[in-house]
Amino acid sequence: MKNVLIIGSTGQIGSELTMKLRSIYNGNIVAGYIPGAEPKGELAESGPSAIVDITNEQQIAETVSKYHIDTIYNLAALLSAVAEAKPQLAWKIGMGGLFNVLEVARTMKCAVFTPSSIGVFGNNTPKDKTPQDTIRNPRTMYGVTKVSGELLSDYYNIRFGVDTRSVRFPGLISYVTPPGGGTTDYAVDIYYSAAKGEKFVCPIGKGTYMDMMYMPDALRAAIEIMEADPSKFVHRNSFNIAAMSFDPDIIFNKIK
């Protein structure tokens, strides 16, 4: 990677990934954002930024051309809880936006990273040591867009040779950006509430274990998969990754 565009650079992953990439690479690491979600502070001052609405294919193409982009990190998405409240918008961004990114990548020869999620799995998916190739039958719009995104990314790789890559993130734990509406965000939100002395009502039941990962490990995965030798890939879209698993009661007892 030399010149990188991060679409959704001010979100939970993007705000930290952009800074990490800038600390590693000397090329253009462009923070793509939409009006109302502008980069601030060090994120704004440490490198170039551009308005990039993922629903606008021409805008993506113009930015790729201007900064000679060779790799796109497509991080634009509505998180799970928000996607359930706004399913039409979730599909427009998650799938319509991905289609735009892949079309630009096809015509302008870019590699693309689009994160997937454990949200692709459903009630019939094996819960322990979940296989790489297994049942994917989500019951949420977020999960549906992620499964569809994996399939579309694989299609563009097989049909057009677009270098698409992905990992299935578990819940991500970070203090840099406040929780944004993900099902697993309780694991961060609970600490904000505790620090403020506020009551916290957990949306996840006691005994419900979910896979989690610290953000630095997630950034490492997102970068290393794009640096990996593609000739050695068994899968492209998408690899299972995990770090730890816990339920809300474990966090509660630690805070208490």
Enumerate the language-model features and the residues they cover.
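N-terminal Rossmann NAD(P)H-binding glycine-rich loop of SDR-like oxidoreductase domains
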Residues: 3-24
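Conserved glycine-rich Rossmann-like NAD(P)H-binding loop of the short-chain dehydrogenase/reductase
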Residues: 25-38
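Rossmann-fold cofactor-recognition segment
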Residues: 44-56
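NAD(P)H-binding glycine-rich loop region in Rossmannoid oxidoreductase-like domains
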Residues: 54-93
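Conserved Rossmann-fold NAD(P)-dependent oxidoreductase catalytic core, especially the SDR/UDP-sugar
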Residues: 74, 99-141
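Active-site helix of classical SDR
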Residues: 141, 145-148
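NAD(P)-dependent short-chain dehydrogenase/reductase
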Residues: 154-209, 215-219, 224
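Mid/C-terminal beta-alpha module of Rossmann-like enzyme folds, strongest
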Residues: 221-256
